């Protein structure tokens, strides 16, 4: 076993159970471990939603228990400039972005890594993400693999990492299943053992999304229409809706043509007219896509894919893998054709590609290729 005692690891301590157990495991493995707590959002007056102070207290308690030093850093300015402004601009453009992916790219594995490197003299950083690393024996570049716990795997959120970042990052809980992580935390008497997982977007926390968004983007109400142009109801703003969405349309009791009582789903956003197009039934052809065009590509190996390739793709988190074919357009854009039509492919979200357990990388969905019935 290699001697880890000369290697310094800076663990991103969030105040949650995963980072707590990560710090414990690395200490057990003999590393010199220190924690770093990031504050990425300046609190507003919504104190009941903002858990930063509570998270910091929990992170400090865990570090005290483990006997490691906790550093603190404020990345709120970087977060605003590199994550939040993009998030708003995408919503303004009628798309549905994923800020957690951008946060990993710009903050956790860029600003954090640079600070750990330059100020704290780290050999590695570590996070409580459920992914694994693989170092091929032939000396090839390191790969990122799905986490062992398929239900918690977070490789979808980390596809923007390069092989250099993968080589510098440790993911101790990626080798474990979640119940085991909680069991370790409990055994070690860590205050975070029973703390529930955070579910909200990092800067919104658990507060109501529509309320939060309306503070920054003025809502423009408009019509909800059927594909034939019949007005079905009103929406409060296109930005509050995403393709394939069923809840929140408030037209549930409305029957369609021929007394159709199936539920309504968002099929399209007509930005020019500020109209939401809704259709009935989850199998409606307008909800289906044959594929997608993706841009802003990131490949873990850094080499663009230049040949047609069979693999699988996820177009949203916790989705079953979709068998597909990648057809390169150029180094910046690819066409992806699904083996079978897929529903709720959403521009602005990420398409992430896999071969087996290996995460190849991904890109932003620019547009979907609409389903055409044979």
From Swiss-Prot:
PANTHER family in the record: MITOCHONDRIAL TRNA-SPECIFIC 2-THIOURIDYLASE 1 (PTHR11933:SF5), TRNA 5-METHYLAMINOMETHYL-2-THIOURIDYLATE -METHYLTRANSFERASE (PTHR11933)
Residues with site note (Interaction with tRNA): 129, 349
Gene3D superfamilies: Adenine nucleotide alpha hydrolases-like domains, HUPs, Translation factors
Positions of the UniProt region annotated as Interaction with tRNA: 152-154, 316-317
Catalytic activity as recorded in UniProt: S-sulfanyl-L-cysteinyl-[protein] + uridine(34) in tRNA + AH2 + ATP = 2-thiouridine(34) in tRNA + L-cysteinyl-[protein] + A + AMP + diphosphate + H(+)
Main location: cytoplasm
CDD domains: MnmA_TRMU-like
Similarity section: Belongs to the MnmA/TRMU family.
Molecular function terms from GO: ATP binding; tRNA binding; tRNA-uridine 2-sulfurtransferase activity
Full protein name: tRNA-specific 2-thiouridylase MnmA
Name of a matching Pfam family: tRNA_Me_trans
Source organism: Vibrio vulnificus (strain YJ016)
Binding annotation for ATP: 12-19, 38, 128
GO biological process, one term: tRNA wobble position uridine thiolation
Physiological role: Catalyzes the 2-thiolation of uridine at the wobble position (U34) of tRNA, leading to the formation of s(2)U34.
Active site: 103, 202
The keyword Transport belongs to this UniProt entry's keyword annotation: no
Top enzyme class: transferase
């Amino acid at each position: 076993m290699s001697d880890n005692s000369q290697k310094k690891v800076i663990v991103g301590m969030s105040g949650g159970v995963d980072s707590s157990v990560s710090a414990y495991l690395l200490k057990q493995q003999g590393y010199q471990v220190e924690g770093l707590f990031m504050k990425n959002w300046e609190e507003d007056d919504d104190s009941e939603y903002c858990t930063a102070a509570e998270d910091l207290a929990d992170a400090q308690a865990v570090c005290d228990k483990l006997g490691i030093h906790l550093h603190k850093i404020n990345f709120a300015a970087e977060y605003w400039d590199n994550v939040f402004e993009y998030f708003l601009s995408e919503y303004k453009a009628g798309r549905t972005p994923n800020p957690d992916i951008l946060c990993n790219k710009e903050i956790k594995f860029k600003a954090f890594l640079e600070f750990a490197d330059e100020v704290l003299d780290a050999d590695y950083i570590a996070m409580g993400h459920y992914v694994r690393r693989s170092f091929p024996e032939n000396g090839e570049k390191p790969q990122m693999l799905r986490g062992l716990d398929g239900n918690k795997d977070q490789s979808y959120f980390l596809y923007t990492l390069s092989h250099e970042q993968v080589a510098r990052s440790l993911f101790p809980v990626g080798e474990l299943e979640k119940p085991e992580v909680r069991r370790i935390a409990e055994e070690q008497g860590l205050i975070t053992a029973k703390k529930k997982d955070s579910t909200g977007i990092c800067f919104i926390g658990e507060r109501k999304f529509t309320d939060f968004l309306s503070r920054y983007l003025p809502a423009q109400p408009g019509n909800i229409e059927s594909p034939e142009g019949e007005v079905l109801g009103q929406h409060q703003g296109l930005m509050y809706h995403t393709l394939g969405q069923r809840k929140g349309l408030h037209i549930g009791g409305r029957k369609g043509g021929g007394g159709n009582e199936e539920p309504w789903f968002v099929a399209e956003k007509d930005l020019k007219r500020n109209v939401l197009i809704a259709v009935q039934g989850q199998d409606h052809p307008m909800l289906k896509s044959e594929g997608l065009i993706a841009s802003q590509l990131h490949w873990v190996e850094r080499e663009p894919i230049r040949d047609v390739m069979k693999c699988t793709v996820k177009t949203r988190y916790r989705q079953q893998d979709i068998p597909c074919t990648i057809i390169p357009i150029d180094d910046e854009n690819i066409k992806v054709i699904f083996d079978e039509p897929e529903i709720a492919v959403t521009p602005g979200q990420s398409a992430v590609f896999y071969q087996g357990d290996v995460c190849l990388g991904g890109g932003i969905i620019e547009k979907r290729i609409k389903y055409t019935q044979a």
